[in-house]
Each structure stands twice: as structure tokens, then as C-alpha cells.
Amino acid sequence: MPVLAALLRRGPLLQRRVQEIRYAERSYVSKPTLNEVVIVSAIRTPIGSFLGSLSSLPATKLGSIAIQGAIEKAGIPKEEVKEAYMGNVLQGGEGQAPTRQAVLGAGLPISTPCTTINKVCASGMKAIMMASQNLMCGHQDVMVAGGMESMSNVPYVMNRGATPYGGVKLEDLIVKDGLTDVYNKIHMGNCAENTAKKLNITREEQDTYALNSYTRSKAAWEAGRFGNEVVPVTITVKGKPDVVVKEDEEYKRVDFSKIPKLKTVFQRENGTVTAANASTLNDGAAAVVLMTADAAKRLNVKPLARIAAFADAAVEPIDFPLAPAYAVPKVLKDAGLKKEDITMWEVNEAFSVVVLANIKMLEMDPQKVNINGGAVSLGHPIGMSGARIVVHLAHALKQGEYGLASICNGGGGASAMLIQKL
């Protein structure tokens, strides 16, 4: 202080210089480094087929079940959850603030702030990423994040205005808001066909990949590899016994002999994408409880995994299937890792061609990619899927191993997240 006082007596120029030094050294954050963020529980519902076993439940109810299951698995009081983010794409007809409905339905305090995230198919993962950022910065210390979708309950709509002579045309919001490239006015499946052509990926390769996805999913269920991540869903039917759904529904509904014979859906001439080698319309929800490492110590909770890195990327809208190949290198660079350091890859199977394209572009080992199947065989509730693949990695990895999940989204985007099992 005597030195500063002496400097201040030497005139205005030195006084200004001292003020600049003080300003530069001033800190506006409680910690100079980011908090470490850990996953302490990771839960999902079974995935229901379109108009299938879970179709009587709205997305918000499925979200409540996943959130409640995750908090119970974490073994913490609900009051400890300071905020919640959930991904949800097809919100038409769900009512105000879907995440708020899901959170209050799970029994969390009325004071819990809630936000719904819509990044199309990457919504569930983006919710986890944004919650992680909140925790890293110290804005909160315990959060819930995930994704939910009930494609079975998405309504049809018609334009407002006078009814014209000849009637009105109803639009399916699944197609309009979830599966259409608004820039090129084409279905996501046509974008997938464009990718297949660009990278010379054949119908036969896609069919083989789809068969492998179904085979892997069946083997994983039979070996109990999904058991720790799935919470049963009880369906109450008036006048009948309750129905308990414990397993994914979609992977059982396949006839392998029909796959090579199916007609292409989006491009009749020289097309490659069929109903079998694309993902299906589905219902489900997934949630994780995230907290800072300090909060985990305070609550005496043993983490499953830590959030190591995450990133987004964007390309031309028609090339959305390729976008993960641009997000993944960002994640690896941020984490200081190489591809060889990754034990398991999850690349969301929106279409078989998506995974095949990213394996080719990133030169990944196919034996490490979606080793327990993916959306082609398990199903693709679009707001849930990004969270589901993170949930699966949190359980499937062994201690010390790294897993990298990536998912493309309509509009030319992708999100990717790296976790390390603890």
C-alpha cells in the first residue's frame, strides 16, 4: 500500500495506470476454474412402438417417470434439484411448458425452474450439455436433464382462417415439425438418400447394418445389458389389471426375411432407404441427475461418470447426416484425446446410412460403434434419443473408459458428448 500511495502522488497518468492494474486483477467469479460435472444417475423408460404399449401416456408423463426414476436412483432428496432442462421436439398439443409439467409430475418442489429445449433430434443431449454448463459455471450445483417424446400423441393441424370450399387439409406435425427439411422442402429420408449417393453407400450395406442393429439389441436385452438403465412403466387401464412395460418394444417387431424385399420409401428409382433400415416413430423419455463434484461429496453420492467434453457442429441442412463427423473432432480436441482412446461410440441411428457415413468419414472401428444396437432397432423418440445414448454409455462403460455419443439433427446440426466412467 505505501508503494501505491507514492505512485498516486505522482500525478493523473500514474493514478490511471494504478486503476487499470486494479481493474485487471479484479475477479468477478467465485472460482477461477470451471467445476467438474458428474452424472450420478442415468435412467430411461422402455421405448414404445408407434401407437404401441406407451401410447396412452403423453410425453410429459413419460418425462415425469424418467425424472422420478433418476432422482430415486441417485438417492437424493427432490429438494436438492435446483433446476431442470428437458428436450422435447413435438410440443403441439402438449400444453404449456412441457418440462414444467414433467418436473411437477415427478414431485419436485414448485420452486424448481424448468426449461424445454428443442434442437430437434439432439434436444435431449443439448439439455444435458446446457445443464452441464450451468453446473460448470457454478450457477447451480444439482440439476436434472434429459429428453422426452410421445410421437403417438402428436396431433394433426390445419391452418387458421375461413374454411374453403371443398374442405381443409390436415397436416401431420410429426412430419411438418419433426421430419421435414424446411430449407429444401424435403423429408429427412431424402436427405439420407443424398448422403448415401454422396458417399456411395448401398442399399445392401444399409440393410446389413439394420440387421446387425436388431441382432445386437436382442443380444443386449437377453444379456441384461439394459437392465440398470430402464425403469418400468405402469399403464393403468380402467376396469383391467395394470400393465407393466419393462422392455423396449421395437426390437421384437422384425421379420428378417422381409428386409431385403422392402420397397424404398423416399426415392423410388435407385433409392436405398427403407422402413427397415431407417429408425421408427416411438415414445419414451430419459433423464440424468447431474451435479458438481463438490455437491456429490456433500451429498455422499457415488458418481457414475464425469462429463469430459461436448460440442456442437453445423453443416448444410441437406447434409445433416454428416454433421456428427464435424462435432466429434471438436470434442476430441477439447479433451486432448485421440479416436483410439474411445472404448465405445454411440452414433444415433436416425438412418442406417447416418452411422455408416460417420464411420467412413471418421474412420471409426465399426466393432466399437453402437455395440448394443441403436435407434433403428430400439426406436427413436426424437426428443429422447440424444439423452438415451448418454444414459447408455454411463452404464455400459467400465471404470476409466471413455465413451463418445453423437447425434445429428434436422437443419444441418449435430451434438456430441464425451463421458468417462468413474
From Swiss-Prot:
Gene that this sequence comes from: ACAT1
The protein's annotated catalytic reaction(s) are:
2 acetyl-CoA = acetoacetyl-CoA + CoA; propanoyl-CoA + acetyl-CoA = 2-methyl-3-oxobutanoyl-CoA + CoA
Q: What's the source species for this entry? A: Bos taurus (Bovine)
One example of the protein's molecular function in GO is: metal ion binding
The UniProt subunit note reads as follows: Homotetramer.
Q: What is this protein called?
A: Acetyl-CoA acetyltransferase, mitochondrial
User: For binding K(+), which residues are annotated in this chain's numbering?
Assistant: Y214, A275, A276, A278, V376
Q: Supply the Pfam families for this chain.
A: Thiolase_C (PF02803), Thiolase_N (PF00108)
The protein's superkingdom reads Eukaryota
